[in-house]
Amino acid sequence: MTRHSRSPARVPADTRRLQTLRRRTPVQLAVGLAAAMSCLAVPAHAAPAQADQQYDALIQRARAGDHEPALTALRERLAQAPTDRRAAYDRMIIAGWAGRPAEVLETYGQLGDAVQLPADALAALARAHRDERQWDASLARYREGQQRFPARQDFVLGEILTLADSGRSADAVAAGQALVRRQPSNADARIALAYAYIRAREPYEALYEADKANTLAPQRNDIVREYVRALQHAGLPEAALRIAGERPGLLSRMDSLSLQLDAVAEQVRLADKPTRTEAERFAIADRALARYDELMPQLRALGPQGEGELRRARVDRLAALHARVRMREVVDEYESLRAEGVQVPAYALTDVAAAYLYLRQPEQSERLYQQALSEAYPPEGDTEARLAAQTGLYYSHAEAEKFPPAGDVVQQASAEQPLWRWVQGQPAAQPNDLWLDAAQVAAQSRLQADDTVNAQQRLEEMVQRAPANSRLRVALADVYRARAWPRRAESELKLAEALEPRSMPLEVQQGHAALDLQEWRQAEMLRNDTLARYPEDLAVRRLDREWNVHNKAELRIEGYRGLANDSAVVGNGNFGIESVLYSPPINYDWRAFGGIGYATGRFEEGNVDYRWARTGVQYRVRDLTLEGEVSTHSYGGGGRAGGRLSAQYDIDDRWQVGASGALRSTGTPLRALKQGIYADTLSVFTRYRASERSEWLFTVAPSRFSDGNDRLEAGVTGVQRFYTAPHLKADLLVDLWASRNTRDDTPYYNPRSDLTMLPSVRLTHTLYRRYETAWEQQFLAGAGAYAQRGFGTGAMMLIGYGQRFRTNDVFDVGATITGTSRPYDGRRERELRIVFDLTYRF
């Protein structure tokens, strides 16, 4: 995500931050204070010299910052002699030094409005009005001082500062510029103008003036101090720290810590920017976090004085933790701040929202992204930051399965980004990179909503317009994989590899494609490489998870149970179950497996119990899957040996061919087994899979029964999607089968020839989905015809309902209840059965 400024500009604290007039004690003030001190309660024998010594001591202490003794003495004097104006003036001046504007105004109020103040007292009064935000009164006093004391520049400077503080920054800048034009070598004038520029939000102009002032008076600490603060406001805290470090004591402890926090915040802003090498990508964030660990205890030690800066440090530290991908700590610190009643600024909420999203708490993330967009990133603000927040909000909606608002967000984001933008200094409009980012997210949003056709169309158009953009090619490859075209995805990724061979998203997608293509060694290499380089990345972790699941053992269980039927063909109480256990991969390409099965049924001639066991090996490499097994079968009269071989070969992404042959096939009808008849089968198929929405299977399967009957079956089955929504899919299913037998006098159902035509519709509705966990229900309904030689044609009807549950990539279970009505030998028979399956990896 794009980084942004983590803290608003910090405004100096008026006169305490801008001491352009050094504290001097004019001759009039010295005389006045001496007179005041001489009138204080002292022993009768005390000489005037003693009063002078007392005065000198009090003044020295006041000038050193210990104002209270002098103020106490002056208060006592005024209590004894309320009309002593000289004491009142002195009290106003020293109270101004002490930063007590209320006492200055109180003392002046006791004098009356008609009195004409001396220059220093008038300056103290003007500053007091300014400190109390009484702008008009302050300006009036400063302008009075300019008229009465034209030689005193502090009144001119004070007017500039007051104009700046009152929000009249343009007037302040104009007045400051006029003063600088009159006195270009006056460092105080340039500092005042710099202050006005800061309030006018022109930090670089302010830095220029402060730099000029520093050149004019490098020996003055007050000038250097304001130069340091100008650097701070211009976003150059490291330079400010370097200059401040050259003069120990230049800044107060609090100001020094504040400047150090600015420097760390600058590091945070750079923390997730691209780095020269992958190994360095966390270096800046680690340095920033280490500095926070040093500074925050110091701020806590300051007590209430440091509370504001401590809160700022904790808020800015959220961004450093985010850049370091320590997302749990981001959330914990945010919740701690909220529990303490701290209002976290809106600009910091995007990092917290991203952390919640990383931790799979999209509902919390949604709320924070929405708040950040409304409060920190309005449409007329920072467009890059706004798009980043909109993208985060989209993913929050999508991962919370709220697709309508997710679509609204990406549409709004795309609408706000023009294709071209004008850049200052460029004669022609420039391509807007943010438009491309928004368009890519919009295209990928269609993939997230299962609208793969639209996603493919959009991304292919973008790739045609920007063929050298590897990110677009990687995104397009992801769509191709979702469309069940792994080879096409692989080709697209090869083109992207030529552009950015070490790109992490590229290698992750190549890893997924390698798993789809059964390129196990390549998948492991890509997984190992990306995991070593980016162990914290969620996409890398997803690839790692899929690789780990692939390397687990696998248990498959399938079964059926007749619930109610009046069919003599399938038997009453029919039940069957088979379980197969596959080992983890052996030397990448091999898996051993073993399984057992059982089937039973009741017929007119009696019950039959069929048991079998099998063991074998599976070989899987690119484009080819082979299986071979030996088996034993028991259905009365002892065990009998059997075997099976199968092969599947992928010609390309769409076409697949395969064949299998079995001795003593487990597909032999139970009624035939009851009579000791078994079947050897051969099956050849061709599969055409246009995409994930369309698949057709053409099968020819001859069988030879041990009673001399030869059966030939051929069929076409197909699935064609005709409606897609995020939580609802509708498919048309087609079953078209024909068979022919050489005998019709068998004890099992064996029509001379028949034809089955059964189109049906399947609706799949997602009841619940949360990342790798999904719960679906299916509705199935179909109507067709069954034609049997010698018995005519009759209607077929099918209705079904099922549910499926998947979780954690390793557990998948489903069950479907179906009811069928169809003719057998001209007689209509009905059956209600349940079919179930389970897959578990461990």
Tell me what each language-model feature is.
Residues 2-45:
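Gram-negative bacterial Sec-dependent N-terminal signal peptides
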Residues 45-52:
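Boundary of Sec targeting at the N-terminus
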Residues 51, 57, 62, 76, ...:
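Gram-negative and organellar
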